[in-house]
Amino acid sequence: MENATHPVPLIELRDIRKRYGGNGTPEVEVLKGVSLSIHAGEFVAIVGASGSGKSTLMNILGCLDRPSSGSYHFAGHDVAELDSDEQAWLRREAFGFVFQGYHLIPSASAQENVEMPAIYAGIPASERHTRARALLERLGLAERTANRPHQLSGGQQQRVSIARALMNGGHIILADEPTGALDSHSGAEVMALLDELASQGHVVILITHDRDVAARAKRIIEVRDGEIVSDSANDERPAQPSAGVERHLQADDLSQRLAEGSSEPSGAWRAELLEAVRAAWRVMWINRFRTALTLLGIIIGVASVVVMLAVGEGSKRQVMAQMGAFGSNIIYLSGYSPNPRAPMGIVSSDDVAAIATLPQVKKVMPVNGGELVVRYGNIDYHAYVGGNNTDFPEILNWPVAEGSYFTERDEDAATTVAVIGYKVRKKLFGSANPIGRYILIENVPFQVIGVLAEKGSSSGDKDADNRIAIPYSAASIRLFGTRNPEYVIIAAADAQRVHQAERAIDQLMLRLHRGQRDYELTNNAAMIQAEAKTQNTLSLMLGSIAAISLLVGGIGVMNIMLMTVRERTREIGIRMATGARQGDILRQFLTEAAMLSVVGGLAGIALALCIGGVLLLGQVAVAFSLSAIVGAFSCALVTGLVFGFMPARKAAQLDPVAALASQ
């Protein structure tokens, strides 16, 4: 039915058809060539029995669904040419939905439900709050703003739904069976509200099967079996179109408003982010147990990575410090077999004497030693016994903590005296004073004259404190039966020129051994570098193993998000109906995945620090690094976002009509 006063319809449908099925399933045509026009200010009732196609028609009118064929023009613009974001703009700015089932988000308060369209419109929070409270007060719900839907009666929930429809103006109210789930009194109140809105100039399109309800409209369109069978004015309710609303929705300015509105509204991202964070927190709190189980995977993953790397770094620093304590100018010389069938090379006393003459060398100390049984009283203990000269404390930077070191006189006389390591002292003497006591080394009595300062492990699990130093001459004569050293420790004259000293020793040894390289030279700096590389590899391996648990935590995030999308499908439909774009829904659920990851990551870091404290109490070397903590947290966040993307994308691609119809 055309209105001569308004030649350009606000809504115009021409030969609209809607089919379902196909692709191997039976095809059903729900709408069969529907054509109608609706002008600004009209109060229209679309009436029909269940299954007549009236709800499908409403979904197409409200841009929740697209027709299979035909044309739909809104204010002179072809809706088929609008993309999904532009149609979302129409739902947000032009339409307001009032559903039979209310379609309120259960976890949000009445005010938060009303504010939702304004959030996606980018309206500032203070203005949103004021407008939402004013609407609720206008509809008699001033005392119910903080109530959740389950705390409201059916009539109150429907009034919240109407307030939400009006939040962004609600120029066109689409009411689908608004009284269907209400008692007669509440239904009458809702219809009175719709009458009032129509009198104020809003376009009201009422979908109902009840002819008494339809009689409240100024125009009644009857739909039967997907076709319009009648379209007539209700003479008892004459039309009173509102010029104000029509001016607001003129076709001439719609293109500009669509171009402005379909892009990101100013300030919308902040409002949406805060809403996403609040929604995520509500969902996490409501499903506390399930959330805790999901967070547990992330917490364990982050804590594992941080602790493993901290233990690896602590071990590395400890070993490096202990190796460095022996001096970076140290060079080691020992015999070597150039091939499996050749005899082991021998470093002789003459070699030692020749090396001592080199200008690049500061000190030379031959060592003749091995792992031997040491006895004190009834205690037998295995320790490394090394025959050294008097330069031992200076070369290895290893002072004597108790007593004294042996002298040149002891060396010349092959005196059986011993300076024991810190660990040997603890094992054999405990807290007793060892100075002056005698120990048996391979049944040879040696008098303890000193105790070396504690040094710790030099590399791997070798404990440098598990040793005994005796005069080189005594070791050669009394214990090992040879004057040739097991190996030689050489201190370079300049710590910055260790490699030059090593080359000079190499050239000398080649001459002395007639070109035969039956010896091996290593320096402490190279050993430190090699050990550092080994420790880095170990740390990487530990971190990789721990990262697997972080990956498992990410899979947990994906599982919980898929479950969340399935459980909140109707909420997604509600958000789309109130103007959320696909990008808004995507950000909503990505934010929730990020929230899970952030909370889990922070809790994992806290747990890691607690574990580190316990390990430190147990004398385990632990060194937390900011880069490891930030890296683990970042990995948790990225993992959560990566694994949360698929569920978020699935949510964003849901069909609004199917989402609203889900249980």
Swiss-Prot record:
Membrane topology: Multi-pass membrane protein
Gene of this entry: pvdT
CDD domains documented for this protein: ABC_MJ0796_LolCDE_FtsE
UniProt keyword list: ATP-binding, Cell inner membrane, Cell membrane, Membrane, Nucleotide-binding, Translocase, Transmembrane, Transmembrane helix, Transport
Alphabetized SUPFAM superfamilies for the sequence: P-loop containing nucleoside triphosphate hydrolases (SSF52540)
Pfam families named in the record: ABC_tran (PF00005), FtsX (PF02687), MacB_PCD (PF12704)
Statement: the UniProt record of this protein carries the keyword Cell inner membrane: yes
Matching InterPro entries: AAA+_ATPase, ABC3_permease_C, ABC_transporter-like_ATP-bd, ABC_transporter-like_CS, MacB-like_ATP-bd, MacB_PCD, Macrolide_Exporter_MacB, P-loop_NTPase
Domain of life: Bacteria
Residues bound to ATP: G48, A49, S50, G51, S52, G53, K54, S55
Assembly: Part of the tripartite efflux system PvdRT-OpmQ, which is composed of an inner membrane component with both ATPase and permease domains, PvdT, a periplasmic membrane fusion protein, PvdR, and an outer membrane component, OpmQ.
E.C. no: 7.6.2.-
EC class (word): translocase
Organism: Pseudomonas aeruginosa (strain UCBPP-PA14)
Protein name: Pyoverdine export ATP-binding/permease protein PvdT
